[in-house]
């Protein structure tokens, strides 16, 4: 029951955030010439994964013609996925989730990436 409540709250949060994302027909179309990878730096079934997959459902409805492919990269406590995301070509074909652990990684010597290495496009879950 608790897990269902968490999923519903995550989906409600995403729905509220996307309400203001209604399109102006004059805006440029998002790249639809290939799959868009969504890097999830956690294992399948966890909170980050469930949130990302819920967000993907909304993005696919909003950006018709674009196919979003979830890619789980849980190795290294999320380091692998977040480093791959930071190093991705900035062409709109790679999106991803960044978790709170990013704030600790440089201090633990796990990686040199900081929040400055990412371009935030939304905050699907915020306290």
Regions found by a protein language model. Name each.
Residues 121-127:
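Short Pro/Gly-enriched coil loops immediately N-terminal to beta-strands
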Residues 25-118:
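N-terminal (or domain-start) structured segment
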Residues 1-34:
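Short, low-complexity disordered leader/linker segments with a strong preference
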Residues 19, 99, 124:
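Conserved residues at the C-terminal ends of beta-strands
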